[in-house]
Amino acid sequence: MSSWVALNIEPDEAIEEEVDDTKEIQIEEALKLYQNALKLHSQGPQFYAQAAEAYEALLSSDIFKYPESISDFKRSALQDSEAHLDDDVAVIDAVETFPEFSVNDSTSSTLLQTIYLSYKNHGQFTLDTLQAFLQENPRTSDKAQEILSQVSKRTHAALASFAEALERDDTDLNLWRRSARLSNALQSYRLVRYCLESVLADDENCLEVRTDQLGLDETFAQGQLRETLQALDDNLSVSQVPLKKPKKALLRFLERQKDPYPYLPALPSHVRDEDPSKNPLAIRASCYQLTPASHTWAAVGDSILQALIDMERDASKFGPGTSIRFSMPESTADLRSSTAGEVADQDQSSHMENGESANHIPEEDVDIANTTESAAPKTLRKDQDASSILEHVDDQSSIDQRAEKQLMESLENQSARQNDATTVQDVPNVDEVEPNPSSAGRKRPSASAANEDYQAEPVRTKSRRTRLRDSIAETSLQSDEVSFDQNKYYEDRLQTYVEADEWMFDTVGPLLSKLGVDKLESLDELRRQSAANCSKSSVERSSNQPTSAVHVLYRDLDSIVKTWDEAKSQAMLQDDTSLTFQDMKAMDNSGLTIFLEHSRKSARKTGLKPSFTDDKVLSKFLKGVNEEWLHLHEVGFAWLKLLLMPVYGKSPVRKNSRSKKWPVMESAYVAFQWPDVLKEKVVQLLVRDDEYIFRKMREQAEQTELQILNHTPQTPFKYTRDHLAYLEMTQTVFEIHLDVYASINNPHSEVDQDTRLVQRDRLMRWSMLARTALSHYLDHGPSRKDSQNSIILRHIWASTFHSNMEPDVHREHILLCLQDLKEMLHRLSILEIHLMNNAMMPELSADAIDQEISKLNSMDFFMKIFTPGSEDPVELIETIEPIVEPSSVEIPEESESNDQSLSQSMVQLKEMRSFLDRGDAMLKLFLWQRLRDAYQAIDYPPKVVSCYLRSVETIIQELLGASYLEESNEHREIALIRWLKSLDRILMKLVTLVLQQSDKAYECLDMEHLRSSMSALTTLTNLLHSFALYEDSVRVGQTPSSSVRGSLSKSLGNFTEKLREMEVRCWILQYTLLKEAITQNGDLFESPLEDRILFLRSVHNALGIRKMCKRSNKQFLKLMKAEFFSLESKEAYESEICQILWDLYGINLSPPGRFLFEHECPPEKLDRSTAIKLVDFVLKLAKRMNIKDLSKSELKSTIEKIQQAIGTTKSSPPLTYNKRILSAYLKSPINPTEIFRAVRGVADLPLVPVPTESAVIAQNGWYFLLGHAALTKFRSQKRLNPVPTTDLDEAITFFRQDLDHATGRWESWYRLAQTYDSKLEEDITWSADKINNNRTELVTWQRNAIHCYAMAVATAIRSAEPTPETRATLSELYTDFGIRLYSSSREPLSMAAFSLADFTRHYSNEESQRMYQGKPFKEMRLYSVWNLARYLLKRATIDKPKSWMNHYMLSKCLWKMFSCDDSVRGNAQRISVDDLLDSLLDAIDTLPQRKDSRSDPIFEPHYKLVSIVHKLVDRGTLTPAEGSQTLMATPLARKVQPPEDKAGWKPYILEVLRRLKHADKSNWHHRMAVRAAHVTYDDTRDTVSAAAAKNELTQQIFTKTMTIQVWRPEFERPGRHFVYTTRYVYFFVSLLDQLNDRANLDQLLRRVRKKQGDFINHTKLWEDVCLTYAKVIRRAGSINEGHEENVFKPIGWEEFVANTARLENLPQLAPGSQVLLELLRDAIELKKLNNNLMKVSLLEDLIADLYSRLYEINMPQVLEQANEENKEKMKVDHLLMASDGAADTPTPPNSAPASEAPAPRGRTKGIARRDVQKRAETIVGRKLTPRAPAAKASVPAESEPPATSEPAAPSGNQPNKTSFEMGQQSDIPQSIQDSADDESELSEIDDEKLSKLAAERKLLFPNLRDRISPDPDSEMSVPASIDGDAADEVGDGDADLNEAEGGGETTVEEGEGEDGEEGDEADLERDENDGDEESLEEGEGNGEDTENAQDMEDEAEEPEVIEGDPPKENASEPEPMET
């Protein structure tokens, strides 16, 4: 860790370095522990327990862990074993970092001394505890063994402690002598001698006495060493012992102290008297202990085999006389109790090095009891008495081994830690045979290794009996607490699966029965078998034994899944047998060897022989071995004799060899069927120990031969049953070696050639030996050999097959041998002999011989097939097919000359078929595969399918055949796994081929073939469905799931996954076969299509609820999809189709209310072809739903997925042509003639048909549906802000795609028009920016919409169906078209869509022959637009007479047509008042009823009626009485007293309007208030009426802060909002002008400037308001225009400069100047706020006129000041006469300082406008204090930044405070400060910015102190004006962008709203001119809308430069002004 030092602190030099005293402290702690232990030790035996704990604490203290504390011996041992301890980093580090220490160091010496004393005293303490133990336990016979064990153990421990002490200090002679005594007690002469010599040895290890005076230790050691050497008879060494002795008297006195431990045993006086078993120097026999894994023959054989392997690796373990001892309980029942200990022993021994076996426990002394009668021969006798050996059992052990154990203690500690972490696993059941015990001693199976991963912590598992007892107790407890019917519970949970299976079996079964296939098991039988297999009761399972071959398969499959183990896992992981054929072509093998391998059926027929499980004989064998003293080879040989000799090697009771007939004696090899693992161990033992076994058997044969040769007539040779037993064993070994050689000599064997040669030689030797032994039997055996004829036949049979393996043997010789064998069988009357344990010759019978003969006769034929070189497919087909497919052979009718040859060929074929029937199923499969490959080569898929089906039939026949059923359970299960793997591979390829070649897959299959294939598949389906029933039981909890873990779990999962996929594939094939069978037998089925569909539905349901649809790559679902979509009518199967599509692609097409089942199928990506097929089905579903509901349903997302899969439409010439035609039509101008023709239905476009795939789905309405859904989605969403129009763009794309394909769909035109309408509305609803700045785009949308509406009407008239739905849609079309026309004619769109200004063309004049520019046709008139809209709205009313909107919009059209001028009307007939009023009354009558009292009523028709009636009465068209009578239609006017005359009309109509406003609770409707203001003001237009109108408007429209509150009602047309706001501002400005309200006008001015997006023609509006405001300012100051010229024109520049400087410095201005200054400031701020939006010349004129007036009224004071200055100058002239360089112009003494005076211009010029502007700004900044910000806490304070820097105090009259601190208000009553919020915004800026600007200016010019130079040309004479830097600062951004003012709530529902055109509103109509034609520079508005009116009133304003205003160049320069 780095340290830092303070630089300002001197270090203390007296600080001492820190010393690490940790070691000293630990040594002190250890000394305290040592003293405590010594104290307790010395207090006697009663404290020995505490002393033991104290010593343990001492020896485990830290000092013993130091590297230097480790002894040299242990240190070297650790270094040597470093390579074996890589995982123990701490030990390695300790070994690597042993430090060198000095003994002179005090710490090191103290440490060593402490360690030395600790070990020495601990050893002494151990001996003291032993002495106390001996005193407390007197020697008795029952405790003798325990006492001896304790003596040995504790003596050993004490010697170990003494050794540790001597390692630290080897000069302790007394300790050496004590160690010698302990060695004496341990019976080790060597250690005694070593210790005694160490006492006497010098530095050179020479024996001598080192002192003149002998010490006690030397004296005693000298005598004891001499005695020890004499006992060993080592006289030479005795002579080297020093002879110096003390006095005898002293010796006698000290004799009693000679033995320090008299209570310990001692060595005898001579070595000859020593017990050899206890003498470590003696050469004694050792015992090699074997621990079999289980009490089975295979496990015992495996342990023997492992011992042989260990002996080959390290022969030192098996010294002379090493015997074998089995560590095995006597009975199987005792095994379980002892297995845990065995596991622990194995764990302890597992850490031995050099690959020692886990069951090797070397012992020098073993306990072998008296031998009893045993089956093993007794070949070794012991000369010693067993009792003497037993006496000292466990007493002695090799001291060397104990020393080694001590020295390696650290390593053992590590191993102990590892052992503690080892998980204790369940002991395997002894009844189960270990799958691969050959590797048990060296390598664990992969499954067991993986299982350890799942053991999280070491747990001692309960035994099986304990777990069962706990489970029973728990179950009984639960049954007491809760009583319920468990079976009923599971039946209820299984009910879903049962119902699905019942539907499936009831559907499939009858269909198959009609075809003659009755193999489908009944569901009840399947469930019964499944319940029996799942039963936990053994009684119930035994009562339900399989009654058929299929039931055996059910039970085997169930057993496979439940008892999954390593063997099954290996079978699963290995390649299936049929797969090996795939590599035939790549193998360089002869056809003969391949043929020989697969030409026989399986040899294992378990029904013929019982299984070999004789534990009693095995127990006797183990006991006998333990009781005898046998070598390893002898034990192995004895084990083999038990298995290979008759009657386990025993001789029968009767030993009369001359008996005429011996009893039949069979060996375990012949009589029983061995487990595979046992046979494997026998073979391995025979091969590995062949030399010893062969020598023993040869010696026996030689001894027999010697006996034969030595016999005499008097003593004839007797051939006993022992000789026969050896013959049996020899023949058996010969047969086993023959089997081994046959297995390694096959084509697929990977055994190397050397091993084959060795085994061939071994087989030859045993063959000769067996022949010799058989000859002895034949020559000298019993006279009647009937009972033993089998041994003769076996030898001849084996010899024949042995000869057949030789490459140079002719086939004819083998055939002759076989014929002889056959004759011998008949002659001996032997039907058959079964050797189940030999795969080479499993059966010896005439049938087997016939098979072999047939095989040899067929050799040429099969060699040709099997040879890899035979690749001609036609030849293979002609060769193989007649054999495997007899029905394919037709016997031609030919002449008799060919009968003989034909008969011969048929006989040959018959023989080959017979051979195949007797042969292996693998051979048949291989033939089918070769035939299939041949058909694949000629590309004929139907026959390939047939070969696959025949392969399936072959495997099913094999599984149902006797060869399979006769196997043992284990073999059957392994075989079933392999056959199922083969079936899975075949089915996978077969299903793929059938689905790919669905049209011709079965074209070559006749009905018989179909029936046999369907039967085989049905059998397989039954088997696989039994597994499905098992899984159902597991799924509901009825049956526990498999508990395997690790790799076993993974392999089991793979197997079960294959079973599920196979079942799915079986159903696929079953359906395709059924479909073909129905085609061939259509007369058997009444409704074949429904039967097929029902088949698929029932199977889909049964698979789906089990989540199996996804298996086999969803091939079943894809088959169903293809079948269902091929149906002509899909309505009846919509739910099934929806389920299929959901399972396949995850798309939900189900309508609301229908439930889809979750089958857990991962969705696939939808492909284009499937998506196109789905279009028709999806369209049918979509047509049933409302389009608004569709956009919210899941079907909408499904439609999007389908469109995404379809992708973009590919372009084609017809499609491109149509696109050009359509685009040209939409871009064309609106031709009135074409519009009227379209309305009559005669318009059309010349589109051409598009012959593409996309045209089909377009014709069906796919693109229209997509466009309509996108349009509806946009129009149905409630919008509060502008939203992206991507949905509309998508709708336009899809509608145009539909029209591009020439569909002629009128509704596509209509919806496309609505889409363009929606885009237009979205552009003009939220802001007026596009109306002001981008009208071209708006015109395009309008024109496109009108074109589309016109074409929609034309197309609909021609092709629309007259259905009610179509008529309703047509009515909507007419309504929308009419509203579109009317809206385009009114503001703000103003007929721009009908303009032809952009469509002028050049024409040639025929008369003048000149070109001229003109319009293509006459523009559509305004009245024509209204008239056409009226016509369309009337058409809409026909079908929807109850639509109030139709009547309302019709009334608006009629009103415009009624109130227009004659110039607009033209020759058209005038609209009658009755028609106008009737339409309004109809609109009110058809208004919908309010839903509840809280809903807002619809005011538009009511207000329109009031407005129009008022105008009609005002014009005189109606009388007041008629008007009031008409207004009775609206309920709001019924309670108002009708007027009697014209004078009473105004109060009446105002009251009606007031009631309308009162009814509008939410204040959405603004036009009633404005109408009331106009009614109040329009008649008189005086000041009083103006004030009343203003009051009316400020109640709702304009707030106190002049915020414009105009909301957009629900039915107001988009864009009209901005028309109304513009009109209202004009009207209100005129009222303020008339009322001379400059304060409110100032605030309104700011609002208008800020909200550019809220007004139409904002620039024109701003200019007009500014002119009005300027007029009000001039009026307030009584200033006329041009006043500046009258004042400044007569004076010159110098006078102007001088006088303005004096004016600015006047201490007191003339009366009236304050008002002018305020007005001047307002004018300057107005110019800043304008920011060049309008031309500034008018504003500059206003400023100049105001400043000239101020100059004018203050001129008298200025002149007076000038005179005073002249007088002062005259007084001092005489003082300046002698001065040089006097100024040309005298300067008054009181004038401004020289630094402030402007520099002279050099020439006389006029007074520039810029100079006046600067002077005005300067004097305003000096004479007026800046306006203080409003002190409001609720909103940020707004401040007005000064236009200049802080003004200098003129003469002390101004207080020395900043303008912000003063906050002074003007006293002028009409001042601009008298606004509602007491503030001004004309040039406000943040306080922070002001202070920053001031600070920057002071830093730049530190000497400039609040003074301004009077020089007008100087840039620093005045601060930067609004045109300069300050303008930039103000214009940095909009400070109130988020404040929504003047706008309205513009988010409304669809619909149209009010019309704002008031025909006779004089002022507004006059002001409403073509302002939008003016093109001024305009900025962009912020477009914000009002959010809350009350907040707008309370919120303070900040002035801003509107974003988008044109920036001013050279802003830092003052703007020049024209003079």
Curated annotation (Swiss-Prot):
Its main location: nucleus. This is Histone transcription regulator 3 homolog. Has a role in a nucleosome assembly pathway that is required for the integrity of heterochromatin and proper chromosome segregation. Keywords: Chromosome partition, Nucleus, Transcription, Transcription regulation. It comes from Aspergillus fumigatus (strain ATCC MYA-4609 / CBS 101355 / FGSC A1100 / Af293) (Neosartorya fumigata). Belongs to the HIR3 family. Residues 380-407, 1808-1817, 1888-1910 have a biased composition (Basic and acidic residues). Residues 319-467, 1780-2019 are annotated as: Disordered. Residues 334-347, 411-426, 1852-1863 have a biased composition (Polar residues). GO terms for cellular component: HIR complex; nucleus. Residues 1826-1851, 1864-1874 have a biased composition (Low complexity). Residues 1875-1887, 1925-1939, 1947-2003 have a biased composition (Acidic residues). It is found in: Nucleus. InterPro entries: Hir3/CABIN1, TPR-like_helical_dom_sf. GO terms for biological process: chromatin organization; chromosome segregation. The keyword Nucleotide-binding does not apply. The keyword Transcription applies.
